[in-house]
Amino acid sequence: MFIQFDSVNGVKIDKPFERELKVLMSPDNNANVKDFTFILSTLAPNGGCTDFHSHNESGELMIFLSGTGRAWFEDSVYDITPGTALYAPPGKVHKTLNTGNEPLQIACIFIPAISTDYILKMREESERARGNS
């Protein structure tokens, strides 16, 4: 299966966890994809981030494609640059933050596959954090 990132519409998550999520490959959108979900996460410049979170049903491999930032995993903090990666096994808490002036683009691969309802949960958590729910 071949895909161009720009051909997929994303879902925008507003502040405080400002980013865009694009489901590029998933069992939810392609019957040929069975064992993983591939989401492109683009964190907004100057502070776009995720909250501290974990995925009980799946591990997450994060491959940092562009931009700079910081990642928290368990008791460690890592500087993010293009060409670095982080794996968070199922149930392990992690967070990413864009510390630069450019978008921070992350290829997020979930093994085993997760439901793309995950994106709706991320949007709801952002709304709750802003006090809008």
Task: Put a short name on every predicted segment.
Residues 1-35, 51, 121-133:
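A short, N-terminal "cap"/entry segment at the start of jelly-roll beta-barrel domains
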Residues 23-27, 39-56:
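Conserved short histidine dyad/triad with adjacent acidic residue
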Residues 40-43, 54-71, 109-111:
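Short, conserved beta-strand element in jelly-roll/cupin
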Residues 30-31, 43-48, 68, 112-116:
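Short, charged/polar surface micro-motifs in flexible loops or helix N-caps
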Residues 20, 34-39, 60, 67, ...:
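A generic structural signal for short beta-strands and their flanking turns/coil linkers
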Residues 68-70, 77, 93, 103:
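Structural motif
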Residues 34, 90-116:
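Ligand-binding loop in jelly-roll beta-barrel domains
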Residues 75-90:
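Short acidic-glycine-tyrosine-enriched beta hairpin
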